[in-house]
């Protein structure tokens, strides 16, 4: 029994390590880029100059996927990455046009306020899409692999226990 205990514990530890690895990989691939983009958009919303705002929006664009929709079950335009990317391009263009205006003028302040409101809407859309990122095709596939490994480990343990009982009864 003691000789089979070590491989069983090694299998359990390997299973735990595999599960942690899958969780980290899934987060890094599906969730972190959008979370990082949300951080840049938040900084852009609080930016006080159009140049600063445009730089943060460009950084957010680089982090976000260029196309696709995380809500793959019932996709909407609200969470379509291509449309969000287009909105961010428009925001950069508006920020560049505002930068030529006189600071603290009515036009300048109105333009910045409009951009900040647009950024807030985009952030809300991305936050609404975030739960669906956890249910991406990749994450479902990796979870299925992890469950298959757990079931295989239990089958091996049951087979080992049956073999141990048979040896014990034969003594």
Sequence positions of predicted segments:
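Short, Lys/Arg-enriched, disordered terminal segments
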Residues: 1-5, 166-171
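Hydrophobic secretory-pathway targeting helix
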Residues: 1-37, 138-161
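Long, solvent-exposed extracytoplasmic domains/loops
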Residues: 39-123
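Membrane-proximal, non-transmembrane alpha-helical segments
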Residues: 89-148, 154-170
